[in-house]
């Protein structure tokens, strides 16, 4: 499967390029960067330190998409919306690991999925997506009258969105377990005199610092006991492997919007 990496010069872009080389059935056929990037014109393999691959980084995505089977995208919300439209024009797979998308962004991506096969997830790791299933089941079994749900996440100092896409993914899983809407029941900020905790609320706490790739814990706190479900990312390659697995799974599927739960056969 011929894959294009967008944001090829970034941390995740370089990780994707390296990881593609080790996965059977996947081949790098294109690399995209923004206009003005210092990486333009350079070989994608040389930028990542793995030697020449014969793939030059360009800022003109559509001709590259037209010759590919799929796109791997961990960029920004605005860029991902643009790439989704181009993937729809090219009728190819678009794997989106970008976080921080607004409701309007998601609607545009959903529209693009009429013609592109899109897999979008707040986290591409296999472990986190299994964790989301466990969180949903725990939230369903341990009801709001007895257990409060708090989601704690920590990432490196450079992360620009909060809560993380993974924290929101886990919050959505907890909300599904409780049969409530996360948007109406989440608490993102606590400061000053807040009063007692509202029954059924799902709280979020965000930490930023150092080089932490991603730590997430879902705490179900009852009277006299706590259940903690956690995931700790130790290497960005877990996200790259998950994204490539998603692309290979989506290749040949009909257009539509899918998630990693679909890829893993965990969507209930």
UniProtKB/Swiss-Prot annotation:
Its EC number is 1.17.1.8. Keywords: Amino-acid biosynthesis, Cytoplasm, Diaminopimelate biosynthesis, Lysine biosynthesis, NAD, NADP, Oxidoreductase. The active site is at residues 155, 159. The keyword Amino-acid biosynthesis applies. It is found in: Cytoplasm. It comes from the Bacteria. NADP(+) binds at residue 34. (S)-2,3,4,5-tetrahydrodipicolinate binds at residues 156, 165-166. The keyword Ion transport does not apply. GO terms for molecular function: 4-hydroxy-tetrahydrodipicolinate reductase; NAD binding; NADP binding; oxidoreductase activity, acting on CH or CH2 groups, NAD or NADP as acceptor. SUPFAM superfamilies: Glyceraldehyde-3-phosphate dehydrogenase-like, C-terminal domain, NAD(P)-binding Rossmann-fold domains. Pathway: Amino-acid biosynthesis; L-lysine biosynthesis via DAP pathway; (S)-tetrahydrodipicolinate from L-aspartate: step 4/4. NAD(+) binds at residues 7-12, 33, 97-99, 121-124. GO terms for biological process: diaminopimelate biosynthetic process; lysine biosynthetic process via diaminopimelate. Belongs to the DapB family. Catalyzes the conversion of 4-hydroxy-tetrahydrodipicolinate (HTPA) to tetrahydrodipicolinate. NCBIfam families: dapB. This is 4-hydroxy-tetrahydrodipicolinate reductase. It comes from Brucella abortus (strain 2308).
